[in-house]
Amino acid sequence: MEKLYEGKAKEVYSTEKADEYIIRYKDDATAGNGEKKATIAGKGELNLAITTMIFEMLEKNGIKTHYIETINNTDMRVKKVTIMPLEVIVRNITAGSFAKRYGVEEGRVLNQPTFELSYKDDDLGDPLMCEDHAIALGVITKEEYDYLRKETLKINELLKEFFLKINLKLVDFKIEFGKTDDGQILLADEISPDTCRLWDKDTNKKLDKDIFRRDLGDLTEGYKEVLNRMRG
C-alpha cells in the first residue's frame, strides 16, 4: 500500500483496486485548526468503530456512503472519491462557534436545523461560504448544492433518531462528501465524536471532542461511553 495523503486524524492509502482506498484512523487529536494537538491512545480505534456502525445504519436507510468494510481496528476500506472542498455543518442546538458568533447561550434548541457550508482551507480558517458564493466561485453547482442540502438534512434526522434512542442529544455535526470518477456524490470521511457534538440527554454531559478542546477530562472515556451505548 502506498500512502497517498495524511490529514489530522486519518491516513489514506492506495489498494490493489484502482477504485478503492484504505483509510487508517490515527490517535492524533487536534483542535482550533490544529493549534492544539495531542496523541491519545485508542482514539482512532474508537472513532473507526463508531463511524462503522453509523455508516452501516445510514446505508440501511438509503444514504449512499463511501464505506465498503472495516478491515481491522484501525483500517476501513472505502470507495475512491475526490473530497469536495466543503465541510457541511448542521446545528440542532446552539453551541461552540455558532453560540459565540451570535452571542447566544449554549444549549438553546433551534427552531429548525441550520445548514452551513465551510470552505476547507486551514490557512483561511475554514471560512463560512454561502450558497451564492459557493456557486459563483465554481466550488459546487446549484444542483450539487440542492442535493447536499437535501441529503444532509435527511442524515440529520436519521442521526438524531439514532442517538436519541441511546439517550444522547445530537447538538451539531460536520460531514464531508466526495465524488466518484463518474460523478456520483457520496457521504465520505467519518461521523464520530470528533465530528459531532453529543450531549447526554439528561445531564448535558459532553461526550465529544469538546472534552479535549475544553480540557474536561479523559477523551477516550467519553468516546467509549458513546460506543458502549451504541453497542447496547
From Swiss-Prot:
Pathway terms, separated by semicolons: Purine metabolism; IMP biosynthesis via de novo pathway; 5-amino-1-(5-phospho-D-ribosyl)imidazole-4-carboxamide from 5-amino-1-(5-phospho-D-ribosyl)imidazole-4-carboxylate: step 1/2
The name this protein carries in UniProt is Phosphoribosylaminoimidazole-succinocarboxamide synthase
The molecular function terms of the Gene Ontology recorded here are: ATP binding; phosphoribosylaminoimidazolesuccinocarboxamide synthase activity
Q: Which family does it belong to?
A: Belongs to the SAICAR synthetase family.
Q: Which InterPro entries match?
A: SAICAR_synt/ADE2_N, SAICAR_synt_PurC, SAICAR_synth, SAICAR_synthetase, SAICAR_synthetase_CS
Q: Give the matching CDD domains.
A: SAICAR_synt_PurC
Q: Which UniProt keywords apply?
A: ATP-binding, Ligase, Nucleotide-binding, Purine biosynthesis
Protein's GO biological process: 'de novo' IMP biosynthetic process; cobalamin biosynthetic process
Q: Which reaction does it catalyse?
A: 5-amino-1-(5-phospho-D-ribosyl)imidazole-4-carboxylate + L-aspartate + ATP = (2S)-2-[5-amino-1-(5-phospho-beta-D-ribosyl)imidazole-4-carboxamido]succinate + ADP + phosphate + 2 H(+)
Q: What is its EC number?
A: 6.3.2.6
